[in-house]
């Protein structure tokens, strides 16, 4: 024993070890570490003695602002793990710009840049092991329980990134997926392949994918390597979804995947069908599947992840999430762990085609109908049937709940009532889709707010890695319009989020994502690292010193300076973070004008805000302004 209940063991003459721990009969995931000194405590690795590390103080997420990066496209900290995707040649991505380029080392190196801009949380794309022709974004999982080796370096593991961010007061928001895996199977749900490679660069070829000997897949398709690509894809789905297209045997006997063949975007099949070729729909209503996914994702929470962004949330029934997933993650995460989901509704209205069951506000509520509370059983088929009934019960806007949690009572702040909340939030897609200009987005947000449990938790942005407000391109409205949009995001209710590079209007007007049909450098997912070369030291959120090289110029760009100012203002005014608001003409008159107030203990913060144009404020309480 060494120190406070620690045991020490030295492995001589090795550069890497793989190990597992068994505690009270429960086996950990396989753990891999390279040469060095490591501690393991409470399911977390550390390169420093945990007893010497200060626990990260996780605050209410509304106090934060979020900077969103595609990890592989942000900054290249270690050229040794750069690797092409299998389809890079089709996309014409050159050796100088492989799809897998940025990494955890790059994020660690540029934490001071993100903090200098003023952001206190970083949303990163999925970290789990992927497999597909174009998987640099992380949404095509092959193993939910492990981190993809293409992100990591010696001294820059995922744990190292989390710890380094926390040391600077920055949260890590992990993008996660439960709706689907990639189509090369999944290590637990459909084990068909393993990756064999001597160096990271070997992963640039599909030849690294080796059929697992003795697997059902190997026995069913012994000639897999001889099939043409179309039949290879059909063979993989035959095993995963039991399609019986190439073989009539029963393969997915545990029903780990949904077997539905049809999908319509505005019907219940949007939650049971396969949304894309590389997104094979997982049977989230199967308790065995839920147990596996919860164990995998709870392990990341135990590493110190501060929040989850749930991908493709609309494609999973709210009932399933409320029953199987949200309670588990919130319990593991503890105080101030935050979850927000992507309810992708590509319409300007807040009720998606007038169907609440696939609309953003709907996903912020707990179940209120007794027939759906604690209703799932071990029968996955019965659970699926219940989700279909749940969808039909919420297929019209009649009788949808409303809330005044985001509104002031006159000019008084009141304690929000979260008794009907499911404890999670969403990306404000209706607001996002209306950012053709700030006024439209602001108006839509005001119209939709009663239907969220509390819209002050909504994550708000102008554009992202998938869409701009016009659907296809990165925002191109000009610097002044960008500034006005940001003024709304940083002062109105919600948690502001900025997609990497927008501080420079990076790649403005170019197509956001075209798959492997053009070089990434011509899209909204281009590599940003050239603008980050040099050094900077963040002295606080939104302030810095010793900036040099390209990063100094980036931080001095007009929009970047504006963002720094907005972040400093928002951090200084609690009402702009967590306040309720009013637009009542008893107190305020103006196009985009409002009053926000937050009262808690000794804090009483009130802000009068006008975005652009004239405004008048009246009947305000006496105080120092």
Regions found by a protein language model. Name each.
Residues 14-17, 112, 603-605:
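Extended extracellular/luminal ectodomain segments enriched in beta-structured repeat modules
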Residues 58-64, 72-303, 320-352, 358-432:
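Substrate-binding/active-site clefts of carbohydrate-active enzymes
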Residues 26-27, 73-75, 573-574:
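Acidic glycine-/aspartate-rich tracts in secreted/extracellular proteins
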Residues 278, 454-476:
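Active-site clefts of carbohydrate-active enzymes
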Residues 1-54, 58:
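Glycan-association/targeting regions that enable binding to alpha-glucans and other polysaccharides
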Residues 55-60, 271, 449-451, 598-600:
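Short boundary motifs at domain starts and secondary-structure transition points
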Residues 39-40, 162, 166, 180, ...:
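Active-site-proximal helices and loops of the catalytic beta/alpha 8
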